[in-house]
């Protein structure tokens, strides 16, 4: 429920206690709902909002521009666009990102499309931006390539399981120690694949259960990992 969603954000803010920034997922395929959740996330203490493209109703690029501009006008919090068309059926194109990047409250994008041409276009938008416009990967398999191509980081599924390693890879790339970063990254290619043997977040939650962090239970319509994958 929306109330539970906000309680998770509030709990996270309290646990973090200012040590690192909190990025709250507050997107919706309803602009009004996204504004409400983003406003509440800011009130609770989130530092950034992550706004997924509207799913199911699949607006065109004009609709996406108006959707995001309306949220950015109404909510005075740093906002990150989130593009994951494989899950939403909605793809925010680079030319649309370029328009949105000019709004002072829209400070970056989490891009889950694994495509070098797309990455290059977004990096170029970032370079041309008068303000810092940040490019984050939303795809563990290609995040190394995105950052070494000029991107800024990753919002990662695998980081739930190996947070230090993902952080180390990013730091090494920033320090231009690319070969060292690549050696670490190559060790986890199999893990990146395993995390998507079923729909995310089923595999990552099963691994966290096996690590002793959470219970082995999911809410419908998600179900536990198929036993044939447990080995």
Predicted regions and their residues:
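Conserved short secondary-structure transition element at the edge of the structured enzyme core
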Residues: 147-151, 189-222
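A short acidic, helix-capping loop that chelates divalent metal ions and anchors anionic groups
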Residues: 54-57, 165, 216-217
């Amino acid at each position: 429920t929306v109330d539970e969603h906000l309680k998770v954000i509030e709990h996270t803010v309290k646990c973090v206690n200012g040590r690192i920034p909190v990025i709250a997922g507050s997107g919706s395929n309803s602009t009004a709902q996204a504004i409400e959740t983003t406003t509440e996330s800011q009130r609770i203490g989130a530092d950034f909002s992550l706004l997924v493209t509207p799913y199911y109703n699949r607006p065109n690029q004009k609709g996406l521009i108006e959707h995001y501009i309306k949220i950015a006008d109404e909510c005075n919090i740093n906002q990150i666009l989130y593009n994951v068309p494989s899950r939403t059926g909605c793809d925010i194109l680079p030319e649309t990102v370029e328009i949105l990047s000019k709004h002072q409250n829209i400070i970056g994008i989490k891009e889950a499309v694994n495509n070098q041409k797309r990455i290059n276009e977004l990096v170029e938008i970032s370079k041309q931006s008068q303000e810092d416009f940040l490019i984050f990967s939303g795809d563990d398999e290609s995040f190394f390539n995105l950052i070494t191509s000029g991107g800024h980081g990753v919002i990662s599924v695998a980081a739930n399981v190996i947070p230090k390693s993902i952080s180390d890879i990013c730091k090494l790339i920033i320090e231009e120690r690319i070969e060292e970063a690549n050696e670490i990254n190559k060790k986890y290619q199999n893990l990146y694949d395993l995390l998507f043997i079923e729909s995310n977040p089923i595999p990552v939650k099963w691994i966290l259960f096996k690590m002793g962090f959470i219970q082995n239970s999911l809410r419908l319509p998600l179900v536990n990992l198929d036993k044939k994958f447990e080995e």
